[in-house]
Amino acid sequence: MFLLQKYDYFFVFLLIISFFSILIFSLSKWIAPINKGPEKFTSYESGIEPMGEACIQFQIRYYMFALVFVIFDVETVFLYPWAMSFYNFGISSFIEALIFILILIIGLVYAWRKGALEWS
Amino acid sequence: MLEHILTLSAFLFCIGVFGLITSRNMVRALMCLELIFNAVNINLVAFSNFLDSSQIKGEIFSIFIIAIAAAEATIGLAIVLAIYRNRKSTRIDQFNLLKW
Amino acid sequence: MKLELDMFFLYGSTILPECILIFSLLIILIIDLTFPKKDTIWLYFISLTSLLISIIILLFQYKTDPIISFLGSFQTDSFNRIFQSFIVFCSILCIPLSIEYIKCAKMAIPEFLIFILTATVGGMFLCGANDLVTIFVSLECLSLCSYLLCGYTKRDIRSNEAAIKYLLIGGTSSSILAYGFSWLYGLSGGETNIQKITNGLLNAETYNSSGTFIAFICILVGLAFKLSLVPFHQWTPDIYEGSPTPVVAFLSVTSKIAGLALATRILNILFSFSPNEWKIFLEILAILSMILGNLVAITQTSMKRMLAYSSISQIGYILIGLITGDLKGYTSMTIYVFFYIFMNLGTFACIILYSLRTGTDNIRDYAGLYIKDPLLSFSLTLCLLSLGGLPPLTGFFGKLYLFWCGWQSGFYLLVFIALITSVISLYYYLKIIKLILTKKNNEINPYIQAYIITSPTFFSKNPIEFVMIFCVLGSTFLGIIINPIFSFFQDSLSLSVFFIK
């Protein structure tokens, strides 16, 4: 605590917050009536009757979409530094970024033609 | 201040290596690999903030590391999928076909 | 800072061979997407043509002065040119090796070619990378493609297992390498260019600190994983055994060459302030890999596993040249790498041919092969003897130069152990040869019985046999002309960045 002088406020807040959370939970436990029944143990699905188990297996399709998404999602990160300094670089960097996007598009077309984006 | 960040990244690195050695599930091993890459990223961003705030080469490096880690994780998950299709399990300790 | 982004037109010629390969792999991808009808001959033709063009360009430019291009992230000199042309040469030899295997295993062809070409491009960039970012990205470009190639037969559980093991271990090693890089970046005061890092470390006087030592250990461990030196070699036999055989042939040479070029550059340029330190570490690793690789190879029963351990020991021999550190040492290292391509690819061509016709990799199933196919058994014998280093063959001359350079520079222990272990290696190579040549009467094993005899005419031979004969000729007769080769490599290496101070 002596090393991090800037963090004094943070630790004060941490203390207050932990105190409050303990206080509120113990209050609700003390005040609230205790009922036991089968309804208590079902999972909460926004008030509707729960359907099926809580641990279900997802469709494998989601997995394929996720794989394709992760790649293209991360590649766009490279466009942010380029966009931030677009005016410093001029037209040649624009062409280079176009080539970069073109290669990404070829990849997307590849995924599409090979059926990675089909649901059925 | 820099020492704390470096300590944090060293801890993350150690947790990642420990997890890679001990984990039984393949997806968990991939997550530990990501932990190590994140330790590297923390190191790079911290150094670039403290030493190289004009050119921020470290942050650029960390962007590249993020992209490559994502590609590696994707390939890993695709191989996990192929393995799961073939033998209905993703546990590392059941891989014992290749031994001396 | 003003960035010159249209520098491509100035420095374009330095990466022209790589650009040709990238362009051709995009063309293959587009052809695969637009034409549903598979006309695979064209795909092979395009890839082989682009590889040929790029190796011709490399050979025309092999004597260049060191040029640093692309804001210091890429360096071209004669050392890189030689190693890049080795990598392209390996790919040219490996694509014909895999044609028939792919056909038999019913794998997709365009993706295979794309992965091979991408791995080649990654290895070529790795040879010339001059920047921590470039090193990391091109290293991963090479290794990600290798993981995919290892798991290319998706239905085969062994191939899957090899791929996931390779991925986990390769990912670990490259992340450890990246951790070392991040420490170097910090300790040098925010530099990523490897020459500037050395200057930064010297200026900040942090080159003796414990942080630099941690970075050095991390980088050394990462490199040793890539080169499969002994305490970090456990992945090699598993991957060699599980992966498809043409892929193993490709990986066993390409990733070794690229890793060797990377190690030479990093250790010589980045850690040029403490040459004695890294030489001691490398010496220990080389001795361990020579001893353990050769001893464990004796007990193996699978041919591919045996070759894996023998490749571990071969990298130990190659490291002698790197440890020696002078012009002659580097020249003999380069020559041995060049010969190693022929010997190793020749052996793998024989194994691929045999396993395609019989479907087995076990050593004991080779018994009595001589009766059925004299050509195959003869070339396998020559390649194995050359790997072991028997006198009139090529491998002997390569080893002779390596050991002689090491002895002259005073690494007596290293050379002594190398000599003893190469005698041990001759034992297990000769064991296989004895098995092939001896004929056990009335007891031919079923694999040999099922062996299909090839047609004797010359033109109906398949591409594997051409590559096999080519490699056998190389690994038999190249040793005779070693003196011109030596002076050729010495001339061009003396122009490289390590010797122009």
UniProtKB/Swiss-Prot annotation, chain A:
Gene3D superfamilies: NADH:ubiquinone/plastoquinone oxidoreductase, chain 3. Its main location: plastid. Keywords: Chloroplast, Membrane, NAD, NADP, Plastid, Plastoquinone, Quinone, Thylakoid, Translocase, Transmembrane, Transmembrane helix, Transport. One of its GO terms (biological process) is photosynthesis, light reaction. It comes from the Eukaryota. InterPro entries: NAD(P)H_OxRDtase_bac/plastid, NADH_UbQ/plastoQ_OxRdtase_su3, NDAH_ubi_oxred_su3_sf. It is a multi-pass membrane protein. GO terms for cellular component: chloroplast thylakoid membrane. It is found in: Plastid, Chloroplast thylakoid membrane. GO terms for molecular function: NADH dehydrogenase (ubiquinone) activity; quinone binding. Its EC number is 7.1.1.-. It catalyses: a plastoquinone + NADH + (n+1) H(+)(in) = a plastoquinol + NAD(+) + n H(+)(out); a plastoquinone + NADPH + (n+1) H(+)(in) = a plastoquinol + NADP(+) + n H(+)(out). It is an enzyme of class 7 (translocase). Pfam families: Oxidored_q4. The chain crosses the membrane at residues 7-27, 64-84, 89-109. NDH shuttles electrons from NAD(P)H:plastoquinone, via FMN and iron-sulfur (Fe-S) centers, to quinones in the photosynthetic chain and possibly in a chloroplast respiratory chain. The immediate electron acceptor for the enzyme in this species is believed to be plastoquinone. Couples the redox reaction to proton translocation, and thus conserves the redox energy in a proton gradient. PANTHER family: NADH-UBIQUINONE OXIDOREDUCTASE CHAIN 3 (PTHR11058:SF9). Belongs to the complex I subunit 3 family. NDH is composed of at least 16 different subunits, 5 of which are encoded in the nucleus. This is NAD(P)H-quinone oxidoreductase subunit 3, chloroplastic. It comes from Marchantia polymorpha.
UniProtKB/Swiss-Prot annotation, chain B:
Pfam families: Oxidored_q2. It catalyses: a plastoquinone + NADH + (n+1) H(+)(in) = a plastoquinol + NAD(+) + n H(+)(out); a plastoquinone + NADPH + (n+1) H(+)(in) = a plastoquinol + NADP(+) + n H(+)(out). It comes from the Eukaryota. Keywords: Chloroplast, Membrane, NAD, NADP, Plastid, Plastoquinone, Quinone, Thylakoid, Translocase, Transmembrane, Transmembrane helix, Transport. It is an enzyme of class 7 (translocase). The chain crosses the membrane at residues 1-21, 30-50, 63-83. It is found in: Plastid, Chloroplast thylakoid membrane. Its EC number is 7.1.1.-. GO terms for biological process: ATP synthesis coupled electron transport; photosynthesis, light reaction. GO terms for cellular component: chloroplast thylakoid membrane. The keyword Translocase applies. InterPro entries: NADH_UbQ_OxRdtase_chain4L/K, NUOK/Mnh_C1-like. It is a multi-pass membrane protein. Its main location: plastid. NDH is composed of at least 16 different subunits, 5 of which are encoded in the nucleus. Belongs to the complex I subunit 4L family. NDH shuttles electrons from NAD(P)H:plastoquinone, via FMN and iron-sulfur (Fe-S) centers, to quinones in the photosynthetic chain and possibly in a chloroplast respiratory chain. The immediate electron acceptor for the enzyme in this species is believed to be plastoquinone. Couples the redox reaction to proton translocation, and thus conserves the redox energy in a proton gradient. This is NAD(P)H-quinone oxidoreductase subunit 4L, chloroplastic. The lineage of its organism: Eukaryota, Viridiplantae, Streptophyta, Embryophyta, Marchantiophyta. The gene is ndhE.
Curated annotation (Swiss-Prot), chain C:
The keyword Chloroplast applies. The chain crosses the membrane at residues 15-35, 40-60, 82-102, 107-127, 132-152, 167-187, 212-232, 244-264, 278-298, 307-327, 333-353, 378-398, 410-430, 466-486. It is an enzyme of class 7 (translocase). It is a multi-pass membrane protein. GO terms for molecular function: NADH dehydrogenase (ubiquinone) activity; quinone binding. Its EC number is 7.1.1.-. Pfam families: Ndh2_N, Proton_antipo_M. Keywords: Chloroplast, Membrane, NAD, NADP, Plastid, Plastoquinone, Quinone, Thylakoid, Translocase, Transmembrane, Transmembrane helix, Transport. One of its GO terms (cellular component) is chloroplast thylakoid membrane. GO terms for biological process: ATP synthesis coupled electron transport; photosynthesis, light reaction. It comes from the Eukaryota. It is found in: Plastid, Chloroplast thylakoid membrane. NCBIfam families: NDH_I_N, PRK02504.1. NDH shuttles electrons from NAD(P)H:plastoquinone, via FMN and iron-sulfur (Fe-S) centers, to quinones in the photosynthetic chain and possibly in a chloroplast respiratory chain. The immediate electron acceptor for the enzyme in this species is believed to be plastoquinone. Couples the redox reaction to proton translocation, and thus conserves the redox energy in a proton gradient. NDH is composed of at least 16 different subunits, 5 of which are encoded in the nucleus. Belongs to the complex I subunit 2 family. HAMAP family: NDH1_NuoN_1. This is NAD(P)H-quinone oxidoreductase subunit 2, chloroplastic. It comes from Marchantia polymorpha. The lineage of its organism: Eukaryota, Viridiplantae, Streptophyta, Embryophyta, Marchantiophyta.
